[in-house]
């Protein structure tokens, strides 16, 4: 017989949503500001209501049953609609609200101060957690550990990082596109030579280890030309490559997005930017669409919709 929602404590659905996000009784309890024992009792009531275990223990935490997986989207939408009713300007800001972002650095650092101010103006008691974008970030968005990702994708047809290769569960919006530049110190000897492909390849390069790979579209384009660069150093972040390229008597070249000019202005690094020595068709393959990414279940989540629009407005000048 069909059960009536009037006999269900709706707080249990919030508990169920948090268990789905956290995959942990302890973590869900912390977010609800209750004891793990209280969450366990709520889970027992939910299991009785749905006549299903809902979650089973696994080495990685709670693993949802097929029934729980089938309810995930509907539950998320129900919670989002509930939040829409509660997210009114004159209502008290919810305690414990978190904004969890995964972003390419220094992309986020350029606007982090402005973004944090806007978040705290609207949600004074919120907390912000920022992690570097890495090979696991898309999975973190899918698992509900990250609200929004902000990162560059690639345009080369053979790249694994194409927008068209994103998982079906991920929605996205391109905020701006960028073509990388070559960054070198202001007194680098290459500045006294003709700037062409031979000069570019004559000097040692700094590579960025991107999603567990030391090569990217630039290396694909060079391979098509039968050429190869000498990678003398591999670093995890663009700002580290810029710092190293700026060191006195350093012959290293860094290839990094054009937007890094804003980062350089903030930190006053003695660097010059030169265009990559390729023709227009090759440059097109090196375009990097900088993209906001989120899970489809959060497409109408008011917190995340607001965060997306706020980030979009902050980076509008770079479009």
From Swiss-Prot:
Pfam families: HTH_1 (PF00126), LysR_substrate (PF03466). It comes from the Bacteria. Residues 25-44 bind DNA. Coiled coil: none annotated. Keywords: DNA-binding, Transcription, Transcription regulation. The keyword DNA-binding applies. InterPro entries: LysR-type_TF, LysR_subst-bd, Tscrpt_reg_HTH_LysR, Tscrpt_reg_YidZ, WH-like_DNA-bd_sf, WH_DNA-bd_sf, YidZ_PBP2. GO terms for molecular function: DNA binding; DNA-binding transcription factor activity. Residues 8-65 form the HTH lysR-type domain. HAMAP family: HTH_type_YidZ. Belongs to the LysR transcriptional regulatory family. NCBIfam families: PRK10216.1. Involved in anaerobic NO protection. This is HTH-type transcriptional regulator YidZ. It comes from Escherichia coli O6:H1 (strain CFT073 / ATCC 700928 / UPEC).
């Amino acid at each position: 017989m069909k059960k009536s929602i009037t006999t269900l404590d709706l707080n249990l659905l919030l508990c169920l949503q948090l268990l789905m996000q956290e995959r942990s009784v302890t973590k869900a309890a912390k977010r609800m500001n209750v004891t793990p024992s209280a969450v366990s009792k709520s889970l027992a009531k939910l299991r009785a209501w749905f006549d299903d275990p809902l979650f089973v223990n696994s080495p990685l935490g709670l693993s949802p049953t097929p029934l729980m997986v089938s309810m995930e989207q509907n539950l998320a939408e129900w919670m989002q609609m509930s939040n829409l009713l509660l997210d009114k300007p004159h209502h008290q800001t919810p305690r414990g609200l978190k904004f969890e972002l995964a972003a390419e650095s220094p992309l986020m650092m350029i606007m982090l101060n402005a973004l944090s101010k806007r978040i705290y103006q609207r949600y004074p008691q919120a907390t912000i957690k920022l992690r570097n974008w890495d090979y696991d970030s898309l999975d973190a968005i899918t698992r509900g550990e990250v609200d929004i990702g902000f990162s560059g994708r690639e345009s080369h047809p053979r790249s694994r990082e194409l927008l068209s290769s994103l998982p079906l569960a991920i929605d996205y919006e391109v905020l701006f596109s960028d073509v990388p530049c070559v960054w070198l110190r202001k007194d680098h000897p290459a500045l006294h030579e003709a700037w062409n492909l031979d000069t570019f390849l004559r000097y040692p390069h700094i590579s960025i280890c991107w999603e567990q790979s030391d090569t990217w579209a630039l290396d694909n384009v060079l391979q098509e030309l039968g050429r190869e660069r000498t990678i003398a150093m591999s670093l995890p972040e663009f700002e580290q490559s810029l710092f190293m390229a700026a060191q006195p008597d350093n012959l290293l070249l860094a290839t990094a997005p054009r937007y890094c000019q804003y980062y350089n202005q903030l930190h006053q690094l003695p660097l010059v930017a030169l265009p990559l020595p390729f023709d227009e068709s090759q440059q097109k393959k090196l375009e990097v669409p900088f993209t906001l990414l989120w899970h489809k279940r959060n497409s109408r989540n008011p917190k995340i919709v607001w965060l997306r629009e706020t980030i979009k407005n902050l980076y509008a000048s770079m479009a």
